[in-house]
């Protein structure tokens, strides 16, 4: 058996002893208790401060204890999301019962700040986080596209120094990105020798090494190299049963775990299941911006057939006894912190896991796999991170959504939930921004020698990847007017290979009064424009508030003028009432580009 010594467990022990002042003891009485592994039909649980004092309490309640009625309810350990990117909304997971997040890539500053707060026992109002910090990737590889400079590596000889630097920063484990991209969107990636060297370097320091993969071949190879876990599965229209079973047997033999991240795979496949958003008990805890991220999607059109392979692999892993952990990849399009866990649990059950097994995948299993100390269980001496729900999620997994109360470090999060509900209710009651009045002809490209104007907003300007440290560039030139025709603009773009996967350059329209300020364009149903150019492919992109990656529709700029008309419904997750940017861009392939654009219109039909 492969043994990895995880040194960060000590932090949890310090936290459990740290409370210098806390509320009165709490007794949850006569509840059904799922302890992270088994169900107990009727138990009382006493916790005091940050610690569960007695997971099977009997007798008279302690003097002054708060009594919570558990009849007809189920008490669960605080849920653990085994795959997130927790760069914002650190309190949001608590509202949905997620008390711990395993972070797969984050800024060192956020990681260190939360680690310090957790060690001091002062992280009660936020979900705890155990992070990989900076992931291991190649120059221009997966993880370099977010605009913050990160160290990268290119050869096996750099692996040990890279791992040692991450450990010195406070990384709990090492995450490795082995991602070559797909189709036309290829990207730099670590080679197999460097991935192997990183895994071995992590193990030499007693750290787990987990690998981001997106193909069956890489999944097999990573397991053969000794990866402790796969932090994604992969989409695909089909997979032979023999291949799924062989992968599961390999994972079992290597004692590895798997985090399917079904929710983000749905996003990649363009499939939206609105169960959590249509549940008022859950959606009422998200503001408009937070809901928008959940509605977003990486896939531009539904391709449910792409989910056949991951569902089959989850089932095979489960049959083989491989630890399957519940993780959402929250922070990405189609996800949201906390709430997406309930969708992930439902997906695991749909793939063949029993509800109790899915609950273990979100509690005791990730705590054990990542060495998170005394959490993930309802047991004496364990951390008092608890969730009380109505009904029986051991029978109906959707009962996890019927949250009665959440405790973090023994403190009720109910005040936080009440404040959030009140804030969301106020936002929903407010009229919001007044809709922009569109011109009668819809035209927003008012190009003249004096100004690249528009009837509202900031107008038009060149855009490029310089904000991310790229070297791409764009120049704009007003073309001589054809008689009776709207003015046209020539866009010359040079896209330069960068240290991130998607360099770009082109033309942007800002609908708000300030950069990236939203405008209410809810009346818009279609964007139309005329274009001609060098025959290359370009991207029409849109962003709205709360969306971190643009939604994109591609078009070809051929040698003759042509009309392009795109319904806004083709931009998944974009809220026209909060639109922040419209772009016409070249890239990501390096090279010189030229297109001409005219008569850009926003139409209400």
Predicted feature residues:
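N-terminal signal peptide c-region/cleavage motif recognized by signal peptidases
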Residues: 18-20
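Histidine-rich, glycine-flanked metal-binding segment
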Residues: 33-76, 193
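Acidic, glycine-enriched loop/beta-strand segments at the rims
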Residues: 33-44, 57, 336, 354-359, ...
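Divalent-metal coordination cores built from histidine and acidic residues
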Residues: 70-75, 90-209, 246-289
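Active-site neighborhoods of metal-dependent hydrolases
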Residues: 161-183, 236-351, 425
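Extracellular/periplasmic ectodomains of large secreted or surface enzymes and adhesion receptors
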Residues: 405, 409-437, 555
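Beta-rich carbohydrate-recognition modules and glycan-binding surfaces
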Residues: 429-605
């Amino acid at each position: 058996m492969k043994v990895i010594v995880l040194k960060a467990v000590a932090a949890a022990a310090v936290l459990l002893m740290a409370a210098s002042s806390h509320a009165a003891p709490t007794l949850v009485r006569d509840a059904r208790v799922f302890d992270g592994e088994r169900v107990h039909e009727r138990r009382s649980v006493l916790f005091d401060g940050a610690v569960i004092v007695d997971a099977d309490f009997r007798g008279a309640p302690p003097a002054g204890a708060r009594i919570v009625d558990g009849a007809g309810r189920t008490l669960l350990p605080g849920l653990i999301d085994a795959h997130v990117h927790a760069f914002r909304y650190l309190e949001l997971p608590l509202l949905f019962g997620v008390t711990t997040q395993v972070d797969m890539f984050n800024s060192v500053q956020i990681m260190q700040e939360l680690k310090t707060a957790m060690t001091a026992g002062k992280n009660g109002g936020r979900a705890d986080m155990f992070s990989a910090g900076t992931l291991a990737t190649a120059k221009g590889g997966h993880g370099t596209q977010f605009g913050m400079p990160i160290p990268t590596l290119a050869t096996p000889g750099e692996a040990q120094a890279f791992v040692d630097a991450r450990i010195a920063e406070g990384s709990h484990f090492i995450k490795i990105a082995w991602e070559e991209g797909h189709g036309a969107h290829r990207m730099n990636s670590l080679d197999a020798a460097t991935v192997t060297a990183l895994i071995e370097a992590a193990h030499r320091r007693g750290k787990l090494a987990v690998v981001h993969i997106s193909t069956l071949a890489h999944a097999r190879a990573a397991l053969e190299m000794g990866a402790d876990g796969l932090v994604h599965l992969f989409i695909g229209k089909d997979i032979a049963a023999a291949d799924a079973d062989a992968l599961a047997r390999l994972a079992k033999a290597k004692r590895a775990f798997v985090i399917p991240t079904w929710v983000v795979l749905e996003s990649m496949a363009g499939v939206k299941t609105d169960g959590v958003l249509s549940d008022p008990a859950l959606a009422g805890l998200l503001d408009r911006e937070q809901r928008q991220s959940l509605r977003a999607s990486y896939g531009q059109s539904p391709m449910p057939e792409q989910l056949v392979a991951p569902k089959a692999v989850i089932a095979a892993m489960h049959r083989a006894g491989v630890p399957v952990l519940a993780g959402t990849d929250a922070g990405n399009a189609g996800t949201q912190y906390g709430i997406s866990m309930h969708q992930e649990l439902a997906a695991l059950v749909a793939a063949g896991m029993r509800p109790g097994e899915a609950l273990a995948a979100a509690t005791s299993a990730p705590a054990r796999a990542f060495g998170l100390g005394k959490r993930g269980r309802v047991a004496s001496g364990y951390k008092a991170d608890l969730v009380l729900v109505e009904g029986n999620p051991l029978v109906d997994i959707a009962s996890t959504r019927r949250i009665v109360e959440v405790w973090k470090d023994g403190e009720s999060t109910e005040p936080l939930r009440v404040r959030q509900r009140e804030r969301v209710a106020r936002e929903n009651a407010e009229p919001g921004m007044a809709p922009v009045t569109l011109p009668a002809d819809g035209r927003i490209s008012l190009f003249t020698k004096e100004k690249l104007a528009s009837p509202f907003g900031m107008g038009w300007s060149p855009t490029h990847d310089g904000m991310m440290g790229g070297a791409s560039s764009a120049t704009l030139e007003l073309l001589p007017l054809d008689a009776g025709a709207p003015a046209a603009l020539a866009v010359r773009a040079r896209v330069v290979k960068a240290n991130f996967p998607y360099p770009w350059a082109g033309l942007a329209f800002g609908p708000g009064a300030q950069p990236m300020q939203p405008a209410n364009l809810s009346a818009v149903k279609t964007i139309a424009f005329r274009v001609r150019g060098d025959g290359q492919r370009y991207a029409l992109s849109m962003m709205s508030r709360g969306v971190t990656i643009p939604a994109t529709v591609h078009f070809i700029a051929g040698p003759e003028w042509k009309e392009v008309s795109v319904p806004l419904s083709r931009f998944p997750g974009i809220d026209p009432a909060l639109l922040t940017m419209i772009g016409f861009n070249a890239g990501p392939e390096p090279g010189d580009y030229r297109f001409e654009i005219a008569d850009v219109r926003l139409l209400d039909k």
